[in-house]
Amino acid sequence: MLANYFGSVRFVYNHFLAKRKEQYEQTRKSSNYYEQAKELTAMKKTEAFSWLKEINSQTLQHALRHLETAYVNFFKGRTRFPRFHSKKHGGSFAVPQHFKVEGNRIFIPKFKGGIRFAKSQDVLGELRNMTVSVTPGGKYYVCIMAQSMPTLRLVFSKSPTSTCAMMQT
């Protein structure tokens, strides 16, 4: 099932990169993220691409965001033109929401059952984003981003007429 996620994300990225490239060569303009996200939704409803429904929609949309960032960076002169992703260089996919970590298992939307992983440290705070990557050698890694809550302490200030409490981080 993980291979389906990696393959689907790579397919979406490459498919829409090819469309953008072709569009730009013909009209000197290309569609943006929002137009391509609408097209992706319509594409998933067709018989030929119904297999994309098996993958979390936000994961596929994140691939489009990644492509949008690559395009913007290219046109701002920060990097070279976006390249097609291949199987042999590994890959990654992001799960921006609705995943859970319970013990040493990760639960991803539309993924049957949890995925066991070796936890190097406890995940503290509110879960924000998760990226699963694979190396060309076949090793899998997961990076979980969590927002920790700041520690607050009360500081009291006394004046002759009143007492005031302030919170500091």
Where are these regions (language model features)?
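Nucleic-acid substrate recognition interfaces
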Residues: M1-T169
